């Protein structure tokens, strides 16, 4: 049986933690930031952890990571 391919786009967006959870960076923090409030931009800087439901989906995309 052939090896499962790792989704390269998912591997660049998500990092696995030691507890088999995945952390990710928020969207909308690259450009056009002048309209956004300081509070909003500060919350976008914080890395978040995926929910359990999405965690199972990402595990299929990242079998070896």
UniProtKB/Swiss-Prot annotation:
Q: Which InterPro entries match?
A: Ribosomal_bL35, Ribosomal_bL35-like, Ribosomal_bL35_CS, Ribosomal_bL35_sf
Keywords from UniProt, A to Z, are:
Ribonucleoprotein, Ribosomal protein
Q: Which Pfam families match?
A: Ribosomal_L35p
For whether the record's keyword set contains Ribonucleoprotein, the answer is yes
Its transmembrane ranges are: none
Superkingdom, natural source: Bacteria
The record's similarity note reads: Belongs to the bacterial ribosomal protein bL35 family.
Which NCBIfam families does its entry note? Answer: rpmI_bact (TIGR00001)
Q: Which PANTHER family match?
A: 54S RIBOSOMAL PROTEIN BL35M (PTHR33343), LARGE RIBOSOMAL SUBUNIT PROTEIN BL35M (PTHR33343:SF1)
Q: What is this protein called?
A: Large ribosomal subunit protein bL35
């Amino acid at each position: 049986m052939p090896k499962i391919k790792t989704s390269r786009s998912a591997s660049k967006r998500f990092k696995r933690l030691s507890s088999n959870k995945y952390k990710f960076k928020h969207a909308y923090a690259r450009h056009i930031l002048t309209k956004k409030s300081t509070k909003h931009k500060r919350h976008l800087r914080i890395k978040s952890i995926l929910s359990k439901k999405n965690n199972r989906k990402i595990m299929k995309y990242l079998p070896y990571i």
